[in-house]
Each structure stands twice: as structure tokens, then as C-alpha cells.
Design a protein with these regions (language model features):
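Active-site groove signature of glycoside hydrolases
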Residues: 65-73, 120-126, 168, 172-176
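Shared catalytic-loop signature of beta/alpha-barrel
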Residues: 115, 121, 132-241
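Active-site-adjacent beta->alpha loops and helix N-cap segments on the catalytic face
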Residues: 26-29, 49, 74-87, 106-109, ...
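N-terminal capping/lid subdomain adjacent to the active-site entrance of alpha/beta enzymes
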Residues: 1-97, 102-104, 108-111, 115-119, ...
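A cross-family glycoside hydrolase active-site/sugar-binding cleft signature
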Residues: 38-40, 68-70, 98-102, 126-128, ...
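Short acidic/polar alpha-helix capping motifs at helix-coil junctions
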Residues: 20, 77-78, 101-104, 123-128, ...
Length: 265
């Protein structure tokens, strides 16, 4: 249900912006004209250490100052830690490195391995345990010095209330499709702000840049390039930041090739 609601909601915001000749970011408050973005998808779980050691510096050369990798599939804790060590040694101490576990660990694993990677000063550890284990997440967040992020698997807005009330996270991550669209995104962002907790985005950077740039507690935008080919033009990446489109609405135009590819006759 929330996926369909999100599509309608995003379309309505786009229409409103075009009718008023303003960008969606401007309609939402227009806090900034660009925000930091982190490279995602290039250091994923199937890739071996040699590939990661080679790819991570290339992301820095592309201008990214933040990047995310993954843990959660290795047979031993030592091999999990090796993934983080490899990326950190490849990029040095001045680049922000995050890590996504995709809900694959339990609480004890999260604390054990989380403590072992603290020396690598991760920017955050993401989605360590199943999303509804608010008390478990709170235990992890309390035990680790590394910030704990979660929220991408949450549908709707009510679960975020439980997450915040249990002090389960240090950073709230919002998936625009699962939460219910732009309108619901900003309800969650407001809740997080009341707890003095920053917000980051999950996927769809072309649209999420409007959301993160418009809120005072917006921290960074995930730059996953999966949806770039759907549009004629996408927001520019400059020096590790994503630029907010200044065109009316979302500032996006679907590619004719994409329309032909996905058209249902």
C-alpha cells in the first residue's frame, strides 16, 4: 500500500511545484541548495577484498568523501572485520566509511563485531538486526561508540515512533517508497528532529535530494545510481555533494527510452 501511496504523493508534489513554478525543495523550505552525498553500490557484499581495495580509491577520485560497504555474509567475524579494514586502509582516515548489514545479524553479533571495527571509525553501522527489534537496537546503540542507523526497511511512519521512543538509533534512514512518499518523509523527519536525531535517505537520490536539503537535520543523501537511466537529466554531483535541481517540481523528465522500455500496452 505505501509503495502506491508514495508514487501518487511524489507525483502530486511534482505537479504542485510545476504549477507554482518552484522546486519541491523550495516548497518544503529550501534549507540548502546542495548536500553531501555518499557513494553506494560499488562496495557491495559479493565483491572480494581485492576488488574493494581497488574500487574505494576510485570513488575518492570521483569526488566522493563518503562511501558505504557491506558486512553480514562472511563465515567468521575476522573476515567481516577484514572488509572494513580493507576499505579504511584503501581510502585513509579522512573519508567517511559506512557499513550496511541488511538485518543479517543478531544483537550479540552486532555488539561483538561492532566493537571490533570501532578502531576504523565508521560513520555509521546500518540495519544490524531485524527492523522490529527496537530494544535490541537500543542495546546495540548503547554498547557501541559507532553511530547506529536504521529505518530503510520500515513501512509507514508509526514504527519510527517506536524506534525513537526506544532510543534505538543514532541516525534515522528513510526509504521514500516504503514510508509513503514526500509528505510522510517529512513527518518522520520532524519526529527525528524532536529527538535531535539526524536523517539520511535511502535510494532515489534524484528525489531524495529535495527531502534532505529541505530539513535542518538532513545529513547526507545515498547516491545509488540505479535510477539514473530513467531520466533525461539528473542532479549534478560536485565535490562530493549533490546539487538540488532548481527547475519546477522535482526537476526531472523521464527518458523516452525508459518510457518505451517499461510501457505496458
Amino acid at each position: 500500500f505505501t509503495l502506491a501511496l508514495s508514487a501518487i504523493d511524489m507525483a502530486m508534489w511534482d505537479i504542485k511545484g510545476k504549477a507554482l513554478n518552484q522546486s519541491v525543495c523550495s516548497l518544503l523550505g529550501g534549507h540548502r541548495d546542495r548536500v553531501v552525498t555518499y557513494a553506494s553500490g560499488a562496495l557491495m557484499r559479493p565483491f572480494n577484498l581485492e576488488f574493494m581495495a581497488d574500487m574505494a580509491p576510485k570513488l575518492v577520485e570521483m569526488g566522493f568523501r563518503q562511501m558505504t560497504t557491506q558486512m553480514g555474509a562472511e563465515p567468521t567475524a575476522e573476515r567481516e572485520v577484514a572488509r572494513i579494514r580493507t576499505v579504511r586502509e584503501a581510502v585513509g582516515p579522512d573519508i567517511d566509511v559506512m557499513c550496511d548489514i541488511n538485518q543479517l545479524w543478531d544483537v550479540n553479533q552486532s555488539i561483538e563485531i561492532g566493537k571490533r571495527v570501532e578502531e576504523y571509525h565508521l560513520y555509521w553501522l546500518e540495519d544490524l538486526v531485524v527492523r522490529v527489534d527496537y530494544q535490541g537496537l537500543a542495546r546495540i546503540a548503547d554498547a557501541l561508540t559507532t553511530p547506529v542507523a536504521a529505518g530503510e526497511y520500515v513501512y509507514g511512519i508509526r514504527p519510527f515512533r517506536h524506534m525513537l521512543e526506544h532510543r534505538s538509533v543514532d541516525i534515522v534512514m528513510i526509504d521514500l517508497l516504503r514510508v509513503g512518499g514526500i509528505t510522510q518523509f517529512h513527518k518522520v523527519a520532524g519526529m527525528a528532529e524532536a529527538y535531535n536525531i539526524p536523517v539520511v535517505s535511502h535510494l532515489i537520490p534524484e528525489i531524495q535530494v529535495h527531502n534532505i536539503a529541505a530539513i535542518p537535520n538532513g545529513l547526507t543523501v545515498e547516491y545509488m545510481p540505479w535510477t539514473i537511466r530513467l531520466f533525461e537529466e539528473t542532479p549534478a554531483i560536485e565535490n562530493g555533494e549533490i546539487v538540488v535541481p532548481d527547475k519546477p517540481g522535482l526537476g526531472l523528465q523521464f527518458s523516452q527510452d525508459a518510457i518505451k522500455q517499461y510501457q505496458v500496452s
